[in-house]
């Protein structure tokens, strides 16, 4: 598969509690992305601070940390052509009220604080940093989907 990349995606506690993991995974698989890692986990305060380091000094950080540590999350790594951009498009805008119908947040998000999903941003190195926070190298699987020759030139 040429020009593939990996990206980090997390179903947040509100998405887990509402039983949306299967719907979200199906959307990415249907798009042709390949799941190369996934696990349920509980984020602790330290990981929340590392993951959201750019927000630590912002007024909303404590509320964000409280939410992201309030219940289990489903952390994933997806692979495919332009995976970061594809996932960001499929997620929709951060605020579900501004997300188009058909996007994950447009269909499932309730409000800015309960927007169901996180995905790596397009800043260089962002996806790699987040993948490294949540997964060890030996947790990432390399395999070929049987439909890859049909999906990619």
Swiss-Prot record:
The active site is at 118 (pros-phosphohistidine intermediate). Major role in the synthesis of nucleoside triphosphates other than ATP. The ATP gamma phosphate is transferred to the NDP beta phosphate via a ping-pong mechanism, using a phosphorylated active-site intermediate. ATP binds at residues 12, 60, 88, 94, 105, 115. GO terms for molecular function: ATP binding; metal ion binding; nucleoside diphosphate kinase activity. The lineage of its organism: Archaea, Methanobacteriati, Methanobacteriota, Stenosarchaea group, Halobacteria. It comes from Natronomonas pharaonis (strain ATCC 35678 / DSM 2160 / CIP 103997 / JCM 8858 / NBRC 14720 / NCIMB 2260 / Gabara). This is Nucleoside diphosphate kinase. It catalyses: a 2'-deoxyribonucleoside 5'-diphosphate + ATP = a 2'-deoxyribonucleoside 5'-triphosphate + ADP; a ribonucleoside 5'-diphosphate + ATP = a ribonucleoside 5'-triphosphate + ADP. Its EC number is 2.7.4.6. Keywords: ATP-binding, Cytoplasm, Kinase, Magnesium, Metal-binding, Nucleotide metabolism, Nucleotide-binding, Phosphoprotein, Transferase. GO terms for cellular component: cytoplasm. InterPro entries: NDK-like_dom, NDK-like_dom_sf, Nucleoside_diP_kinase. GO terms for biological process: CTP biosynthetic process; GTP biosynthetic process; UTP biosynthetic process. Its main location: cytoplasm. The gene is ndk. The keyword Metal-binding applies. Disulfide bonds: none annotated. Belongs to the NDK family. It is found in: Cytoplasm. It holds the Pfam family NDK. Its cofactor is Mg(2+).
């Amino acid at each position: 598969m040429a020009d593939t990349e990996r990206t980090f995606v997390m179903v947040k506690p509100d998405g887990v509690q509402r039983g949306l993991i299967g719907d979200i995974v199906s959307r990415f698989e249907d798009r042709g992305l390949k799941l190369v890692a996934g696990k349920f986990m509980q984020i602790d305060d330290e990981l929340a601070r590392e993951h959201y380091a750019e927000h630590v000094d912002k007024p909303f950080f404590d509320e964000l940390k409280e939410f992201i540590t309030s219940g289990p999350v489903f952390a994933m790594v997806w692979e495919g052509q332009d995976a970061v951009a594809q996932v960001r498009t499929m997620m929709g805008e951060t605020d579900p009220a501004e997300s188009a119908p058909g996007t994950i947040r447009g269909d499932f998000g309730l409000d800015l604080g309960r927007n169901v999903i996180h995905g790596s941003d397009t800043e260089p190195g962002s996806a790699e940093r987040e993948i490294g926070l949540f997964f060890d190298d030996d947790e990432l699987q390399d395999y070929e989907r049987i439909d890859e020759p049909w999906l990619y030139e």
